[in-house]
Swiss-Prot record:
Active site residues per record: C146 (nucleophile)
Binding site for dUMP: R21, R126, R127, R166, S167, C168, D169, N177, H207, L208, Y209
Gene: thyA
Chain sites annotated for binding (6R)-5,10-methylene-5,6,7,8-tetrahydrofolate: H51, D169, A263
Residues passing through the membrane, by range: none
Organism of origin: Salmonella paratyphi C (strain RKS4594)
Protein name stated in the entry: Thymidylate synthase
Gene3D superfamilies, sorted: Thymidylate synthase/dCMP hydroxymethylase domain (3.30.572.10)
PANTHER family: THYMIDYLATE SYNTHASE, THYMIDYLATE SYNTHASE 1
Amino acid sequence: MKQYLELMQKVLDEGTQKNDRTGTGTLSIFGHQMRFNLQEGFPLVTTKHCHLRSIIHELLWFLQGDTNIAYLHENNVTIWDEWADENGDLGPVYGKQWRAWPTPDGRHIDQIATVLSQLKNDPDSRRIIVSAWNVGELDKMALAPCHAFFQFYVADGKLSCQLYQRSCDVFLGLPFNIASYALLVHMMAQQCDLDVGDFVWTGGDTHLYSNHMEQTHLQLSREPRALPKLVIKRKPDSLFDYRFDDFEIEGYDPHPGIKAPVAI
Protein backbone atom coordinates (compact mmCIF):
# COMPACT_ATOMS: atom_id res chain seq x y z
CA MET A 1 0.00 0.00 0.00
CA LYS A 2 2.91 2.31 -0.72
CA GLN A 3 0.75 4.44 -3.01
CA TYR A 4 -1.64 5.17 -0.12
CA LEU A 5 1.27 6.57 1.90
CA GLU A 6 2.41 8.53 -1.15
CA LEU A 7 -1.05 10.10 -1.33
CA MET A 8 -0.87 11.11 2.34
CA GLN A 9 2.50 12.74 1.73
CA LYS A 10 1.19 14.52 -1.36
CA VAL A 11 -1.68 16.04 0.61
CA LEU A 12 0.79 17.22 3.26
CA ASP A 13 3.14 18.68 0.65
CA GLU A 14 0.68 20.17 -1.82
CA GLY A 15 -2.61 20.52 0.02
CA THR A 16 -4.51 23.79 0.31
CA GLN A 17 -6.02 24.77 3.65
CA LYS A 18 -9.78 24.73 3.33
CA ASN A 19 -12.81 25.12 5.53
CA ASP A 20 -15.34 22.30 5.45
CA ARG A 21 -18.88 21.35 6.43
CA THR A 22 -17.78 19.93 9.80
CA GLY A 23 -15.89 23.07 10.87
CA THR A 24 -12.71 21.05 11.48
CA GLY A 25 -10.57 22.35 8.62
CA THR A 26 -8.57 20.34 6.10
CA LEU A 27 -5.53 20.17 3.87
CA SER A 28 -7.00 19.29 0.49
CA ILE A 29 -5.98 18.38 -3.05
CA PHE A 30 -8.33 17.85 -5.98
CA GLY A 31 -8.12 14.90 -8.34
CA HIS A 32 -5.98 11.86 -7.58
CA GLN A 33 -5.94 8.28 -8.84
CA MET A 34 -4.57 5.00 -7.51
CA ARG A 35 -4.64 1.55 -9.13
CA PHE A 36 -4.52 -1.71 -7.18
CA ASN A 37 -3.87 -5.01 -8.96
CA LEU A 38 -6.06 -7.39 -6.97
CA GLN A 39 -4.04 -10.33 -8.23
CA GLU A 40 -1.15 -9.09 -6.10
CA GLY A 41 -2.95 -9.21 -2.76
CA PHE A 42 -5.89 -7.71 -0.92
CA PRO A 43 -5.40 -3.93 -0.55
CA LEU A 44 -5.82 -3.61 3.20
CA VAL A 45 -3.60 -0.95 4.78
CA THR A 46 -0.79 -2.47 6.85
CA THR A 47 0.76 0.67 8.38
CA LYS A 48 -2.07 0.64 10.93
CA HIS A 49 -4.59 -2.00 11.92
CA CYS A 50 -7.89 -1.75 10.00
CA HIS A 51 -11.09 -3.13 11.52
CA LEU A 52 -12.00 -5.67 8.87
CA ARG A 53 -15.16 -6.75 10.71
CA SER A 54 -16.65 -3.29 10.17
CA ILE A 55 -15.67 -3.25 6.49
CA ILE A 56 -17.28 -6.62 5.75
CA HIS A 57 -20.45 -6.02 7.74
CA GLU A 58 -20.94 -2.56 6.22
CA LEU A 59 -20.69 -3.94 2.68
CA LEU A 60 -23.12 -6.78 3.45
CA TRP A 61 -25.46 -4.17 4.95
CA PHE A 62 -25.25 -2.02 1.81
CA LEU A 63 -25.98 -5.05 -0.39
CA GLN A 64 -29.12 -5.85 1.58
CA GLY A 65 -30.45 -2.38 0.80
CA ASP A 66 -30.58 -1.59 4.51
CA THR A 67 -30.42 1.98 5.81
CA ASN A 68 -30.99 1.39 9.53
CA ILE A 69 -28.03 0.74 11.81
CA ALA A 70 -29.73 -2.08 13.76
CA TYR A 71 -27.90 -4.79 11.76
CA LEU A 72 -24.60 -3.01 12.31
CA HIS A 73 -25.22 -2.79 16.06
CA GLU A 74 -26.10 -6.49 16.21
CA ASN A 75 -22.60 -7.10 14.86
CA ASN A 76 -20.78 -4.55 17.05
CA VAL A 77 -20.18 -2.09 14.21
CA THR A 78 -20.57 1.56 15.22
CA ILE A 79 -19.14 3.47 12.24
CA TRP A 80 -22.52 4.98 11.28
CA ASP A 81 -23.74 5.84 14.78
CA GLU A 82 -22.95 9.57 14.62
CA TRP A 83 -25.28 10.13 11.66
CA ALA A 84 -28.31 7.99 12.61
CA ASP A 85 -31.49 9.47 14.07
CA GLU A 86 -33.08 8.32 17.34
CA ASN A 87 -34.59 5.30 15.55
CA GLY A 88 -31.33 4.29 13.92
CA ASP A 89 -32.42 5.50 10.48
CA LEU A 90 -30.13 7.25 8.00
CA GLY A 91 -32.55 8.10 5.22
CA PRO A 92 -32.08 6.87 1.62
CA VAL A 93 -28.28 6.37 1.78
CA TYR A 94 -26.13 3.85 -0.11
CA GLY A 95 -28.17 0.69 0.40
CA LYS A 96 -31.38 2.32 -0.77
CA GLN A 97 -29.80 3.81 -3.90
CA TRP A 98 -27.91 0.62 -4.78
CA ARG A 99 -30.92 -1.67 -4.43
CA ALA A 100 -34.04 0.48 -4.82
CA TRP A 101 -33.40 3.69 -6.78
CA PRO A 102 -36.86 5.30 -7.15
CA THR A 103 -38.23 6.19 -10.58
CA PRO A 104 -40.81 8.90 -11.39
CA ASP A 105 -43.49 6.29 -12.14
CA GLY A 106 -43.20 4.69 -8.69
CA ARG A 107 -40.97 1.73 -9.57
CA HIS A 108 -37.58 0.96 -8.04
CA ILE A 109 -34.40 -0.03 -9.86
CA ASP A 110 -32.09 -2.61 -8.30
CA GLN A 111 -28.79 -1.30 -9.64
CA ILE A 112 -26.71 -4.13 -8.17
CA ALA A 113 -28.88 -6.85 -9.71
CA THR A 114 -28.77 -4.93 -12.99
CA VAL A 115 -24.97 -4.77 -13.13
CA LEU A 116 -24.73 -8.46 -12.22
CA SER A 117 -26.98 -9.27 -15.16
CA GLN A 118 -24.92 -7.02 -17.44
CA LEU A 119 -21.66 -8.65 -16.37
CA LYS A 120 -23.05 -12.08 -17.14
CA ASN A 121 -24.90 -11.24 -20.35
CA ASP A 122 -23.19 -8.18 -21.84
CA PRO A 123 -19.72 -7.91 -20.27
CA ASP A 124 -18.41 -5.55 -22.97
CA SER A 125 -21.03 -2.93 -22.14
CA ARG A 126 -19.74 0.52 -21.20
CA ARG A 127 -22.80 1.11 -19.04
CA ILE A 128 -22.11 -1.27 -16.15
CA ILE A 129 -22.48 1.49 -13.58
CA VAL A 130 -23.91 2.05 -10.09
CA SER A 131 -24.62 5.54 -8.77
CA ALA A 132 -25.47 6.52 -5.21
CA TRP A 133 -25.72 10.22 -6.09
CA ASN A 134 -29.48 10.67 -6.33
CA VAL A 135 -29.93 14.43 -6.58
CA GLY A 136 -33.64 14.17 -5.80
CA GLU A 137 -33.02 12.50 -2.43
CA LEU A 138 -29.81 14.13 -1.18
CA ASP A 139 -31.68 16.33 1.27
CA LYS A 140 -33.26 13.24 2.88
CA MET A 141 -29.92 11.51 3.51
CA ALA A 142 -28.14 11.76 6.86
CA LEU A 143 -24.89 12.02 4.89
CA ALA A 144 -24.53 12.63 1.16
CA PRO A 145 -22.66 9.79 -0.61
CA CYS A 146 -18.89 10.19 -0.51
CA HIS A 147 -18.13 7.15 -2.69
CA ALA A 148 -20.70 8.10 -5.24
CA PHE A 149 -20.26 6.33 -8.58
CA PHE A 150 -18.57 3.12 -9.74
CA GLN A 151 -18.16 1.27 -13.02
CA PHE A 152 -17.21 -2.33 -13.83
CA TYR A 153 -15.05 -3.41 -16.75
CA VAL A 154 -14.31 -6.91 -18.09
CA ALA A 155 -11.22 -7.75 -20.16
CA ASP A 156 -9.31 -11.01 -20.63
CA GLY A 157 -11.58 -12.81 -18.20
CA LYS A 158 -10.84 -10.34 -15.39
CA LEU A 159 -13.22 -8.00 -13.60
CA SER A 160 -12.04 -4.49 -12.77
CA CYS A 161 -13.83 -1.61 -11.08
CA GLN A 162 -13.29 2.14 -10.94
CA LEU A 163 -14.76 4.22 -8.13
CA TYR A 164 -15.23 7.99 -8.12
CA GLN A 165 -15.18 9.36 -4.59
CA ARG A 166 -16.26 12.98 -4.50
CA SER A 167 -15.02 13.53 -0.93
CA CYS A 168 -12.30 11.52 0.80
CA ASP A 169 -11.12 11.50 4.41
CA VAL A 170 -7.66 10.11 3.64
CA PHE A 171 -6.66 9.04 7.15
CA LEU A 172 -9.86 7.46 8.50
CA GLY A 173 -12.14 6.76 5.57
CA LEU A 174 -9.99 5.84 2.59
CA PRO A 175 -8.54 2.55 3.92
CA PHE A 176 -12.12 1.37 4.51
CA ASN A 177 -13.26 2.47 1.04
CA ILE A 178 -10.40 0.74 -0.78
CA ALA A 179 -10.91 -2.53 1.09
CA SER A 180 -14.70 -2.42 0.74
CA TYR A 181 -14.70 -2.02 -3.03
CA ALA A 182 -11.89 -4.56 -3.44
CA LEU A 183 -14.07 -7.00 -1.51
CA LEU A 184 -17.05 -6.18 -3.74
CA VAL A 185 -14.96 -6.87 -6.86
CA HIS A 186 -13.95 -10.27 -5.47
CA MET A 187 -17.59 -11.12 -4.71
CA MET A 188 -18.84 -9.95 -8.10
CA ALA A 189 -16.06 -11.82 -9.89
CA GLN A 190 -16.88 -15.05 -8.07
CA GLN A 191 -20.58 -14.73 -8.94
CA CYS A 192 -19.73 -14.11 -12.61
CA ASP A 193 -17.00 -16.78 -12.89
CA LEU A 194 -14.33 -14.16 -13.58
CA ASP A 195 -10.90 -13.53 -12.12
CA VAL A 196 -10.22 -10.26 -10.33
CA GLY A 197 -8.44 -7.48 -12.20
CA ASP A 198 -7.77 -3.95 -10.93
CA PHE A 199 -9.51 -1.68 -8.48
CA VAL A 200 -9.04 1.93 -9.59
CA TRP A 201 -9.74 4.63 -7.03
CA THR A 202 -10.34 8.20 -8.21
CA GLY A 203 -10.73 10.98 -5.67
CA GLY A 204 -12.23 14.45 -5.93
CA ASP A 205 -11.76 16.58 -2.80
CA THR A 206 -9.07 14.43 -1.18
CA HIS A 207 -8.20 15.72 2.27
CA LEU A 208 -6.55 15.26 5.64
CA TYR A 209 -8.41 16.79 8.58
CA SER A 210 -6.43 19.27 10.66
CA ASN A 211 -6.87 17.08 13.76
CA HIS A 212 -5.36 14.04 11.99
CA MET A 213 -1.89 15.50 11.36
CA GLU A 214 -0.08 13.83 14.26
CA GLN A 215 -1.61 10.48 13.34
CA THR A 216 -0.69 10.95 9.68
CA HIS A 217 2.96 11.61 10.48
CA LEU A 218 3.04 8.54 12.73
CA GLN A 219 1.64 6.37 9.97
CA LEU A 220 4.10 7.77 7.43
CA SER A 221 6.96 6.77 9.72
CA ARG A 222 6.01 3.10 9.39
CA GLU A 223 7.16 0.67 6.74
CA PRO A 224 4.39 -1.09 4.74
CA ARG A 225 4.19 -4.85 5.14
CA ALA A 226 3.16 -7.57 2.69
CA LEU A 227 -0.46 -7.45 1.58
CA PRO A 228 -2.76 -10.15 2.93
CA LYS A 229 -4.80 -12.58 0.84
CA LEU A 230 -8.60 -12.72 0.73
CA VAL A 231 -10.17 -16.18 0.85
CA ILE A 232 -13.87 -16.64 0.05
CA LYS A 233 -14.76 -19.99 1.58
CA ARG A 234 -17.85 -20.79 -0.49
CA LYS A 235 -19.81 -19.57 -3.49
CA PRO A 236 -23.34 -18.63 -2.38
CA ASP A 237 -26.30 -18.90 -4.73
CA SER A 238 -26.34 -15.13 -5.22
CA LEU A 239 -24.42 -11.98 -4.38
CA PHE A 240 -26.97 -11.26 -1.68
CA ASP A 241 -26.43 -14.53 0.20
CA TYR A 242 -22.90 -13.97 1.46
CA ARG A 243 -22.34 -14.10 5.22
CA PHE A 244 -19.61 -12.64 7.36
CA ASP A 245 -18.11 -16.07 7.99
CA ASP A 246 -17.62 -16.62 4.24
CA PHE A 247 -14.56 -14.35 4.28
CA GLU A 248 -11.12 -14.90 5.68
CA ILE A 249 -8.02 -12.73 5.46
CA GLU A 250 -4.76 -14.66 5.49
CA GLY A 251 -1.42 -13.13 6.37
CA TYR A 252 -2.62 -9.77 7.71
CA ASP A 253 0.19 -8.48 9.93
CA PRO A 254 -0.41 -4.75 10.41
CA HIS A 255 1.24 -2.20 12.63
CA PRO A 256 -0.84 -1.19 15.70
CA GLY A 257 -4.00 0.84 15.25
CA ILE A 258 -3.96 4.64 15.38
CA LYS A 259 -6.97 6.40 16.89
CA ALA A 260 -8.30 9.64 15.45
CA PRO A 261 -11.50 11.69 15.88
CA VAL A 262 -14.26 11.51 13.29
CA ALA A 263 -15.40 14.79 11.73
CA ILE A 264 -19.22 14.82 11.95
